Amino acid sequence: MNIHEHQAKAVLKSFGAPVAEGVAIFSADEAAAAADQLPGPLWVVKSQIHAGGRGKGKFKELGSDAKGGVRLAFSKEDVVKNAKEMLGNTLVTHQTGPEGKRVNRLYIEDGADIATELYCSLLVNRETGQVAFVVSTEGGMDIEEVAAETPEKIQTIDIDPSTGVTDASAAAVCDALKLEGQAREDMMGLAKILYTAFCEKDMSMLEINPLIVMDNGHVRVLDAKVSFDGNALFRHPDIMELRDTTEEDEKEIEASKYDLAYVALDGDIGCMVNGAGLAMATMDIIKLYGAEPANFLDVGGGATTEKVTAAFKIITADPNVKGILVNIFGGIMRCDVIAEGVVTAVKDVGLQVPLVVRLEGTNVAKGKQIINESGLNVIAADDLDDAAQKIVAAVKEAN
């Protein structure tokens, strides 16, 4: 689960991280009052959407010469003017896609005198199984660009879970960021704060870009992006309260009601699979044969007919879907349950696109019988390779 920048900063501040004072607003009328609460004379007006690249982004409704989603204001009048321009409009960044995201809230923040911009993030290093700091002296820009153009400027420091952040590992972070004096002293403490927050709140990613050194030598969290492990949210009702469903894909929200692992993608072949590994392999082989998956969807091992029906309806609700591949290897999951769910869903919503079904495993004969006797126009496949080729060919033929 993702949260907004102002929420992420509030979480980090509760652990002792240095952040600027700020106020979240939802209407232009609140902008002047927010500015009054902050000392000035510089304010920063920030669009709050679940996407990066806001500063370089552009609003659809404004001219090409209009400012982006993060703006400096040198008077309270400027704060109000920017708020009126930004709220309710659609911000397009490199992470939102061309459709952009509507800005429903802003964060008015006290400005800072920036001497140096750095990059600092925490995530789980899948190679070592440890939480790691990923840091760079190249802050304030897209870390993807740094990784592509100058990867040597990114350093990873793994943290031993049995010790947490020691003075030695905190010093390694400071060395990688080339910090000295007051900034180094601040970062020694901040590294421990960030690690504690990451672990205690079950975060999956914590990104600070930029982490700044101010003119007075102190460090400050200037921007913060936090994602939480969805499987651990039951332990954090305070974090659950921060969820903003207006920032989420409607299909993903619907999928969460049925405990379906669903992620919307940009392709045109819908996928319904059991098991995350098989789902990823299915997506890979679709790409191998020249097409793009429209989603990741794992129905899990204990799916019911109702759950499968819901999954199928979610896939067909995507207007970009031009074909559907159902790929089931039944171990815990029974093929007849999948078949019943598919048949029920198709009869409910109608089937306007090609459908390829590959079933193997528990009750496979019964599952195939259910589909064959349904009277539906379903293309049967014997294995994953055969299924991928058939759905790609069927979509090309239909379009």
Swiss-Prot record:
Listed InterPro entries: ATP-grasp, ATP-grasp_succ-CoA_synth-type, ATP_grasp_subdomain_1, Succ-CoA_synthase_bsu_CS, SUCC_ACL_C, Succ_CoA_ligase-like_bsu, Succinyl-CoA_synth-like
One Pfam family this sequence matches: ATP-grasp_2
Spans traversing the lipid bilayer: none
Binding positions (Mg(2+)): 209, 223
Domain of life: Bacteria
Biological processes per GO annotation: succinyl-CoA metabolic process; tricarboxylic acid cycle
SUPFAM superfamilies given in the database record: Glutathione synthetase ATP-binding domain-like, Succinyl-CoA synthetase domains
Residues holding substrate: 274, 331-333
Official protein name in the record: Succinate--CoA ligase [ADP-forming] subunit beta
Organism for this UniProt entry: Maricaulis maris (strain MCS10) (Caulobacter maris)
Gene: sucC
